[in-house]
């Protein structure tokens, strides 16, 4: 705000002019945002910023869609790591110009194997065979055999485990999602349970997802310690792995 410093003296900004203490006058500079949007030398920066912003939106959408599963298996850098992965997918768009590239589900392969908890890997925890496939409105996980005693590397103090399986369908244009429902999960089981054979878990959507949607299936495991009939998450969930094992 301009201030009058004498009979004729003015210091500050009036309209588009800046009056300085030494008596000099200059035009008010354009805002940083306006300069950023128009400067030719910042074209590449604007393009990168646009695609980074879109990647962040995609990352949040996926995290929101899997919020329940992620709540027990994530790390402090999940948002930035997933945004980086989404940025990689956007970079595979060979149709739109730089700065206008978008997510194409046909380029979603870089998301396969993404680990939501960097401190706990699927490959170092789950040693039993399984397969995740999709058809129509269903994403299915099949487990030929699972012996909890030998096939799960449970951290010390674990008494029970819970196999996590979830799926979501994401509309990357409208930024909306639909969650599938697993009708018959295995539930929480003792780590010394008898071996399981030929198990099938089915995550069903209300209807088959649109072809353009990103469909994601995640697999993980939660560890618990039972005390007086109650199940307590082990190590504040820091040892629970969760990874994307299906994309379409």
Segment roles from a protein language model:
Residues 1-120:
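Long, polar/Ser/Thr-enriched low-complexity segments
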Residues 33, 42-44, 50-53, 83-86, ...:
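Glycine-rich loops and low-complexity Gly/Arg-rich segments
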Residues 90-236:
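Charged linear interaction tracts used for macromolecular binding and regulation
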Residues 233-247:
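Low-complexity, polybasic segments enriched for Lys interleaved with small residues
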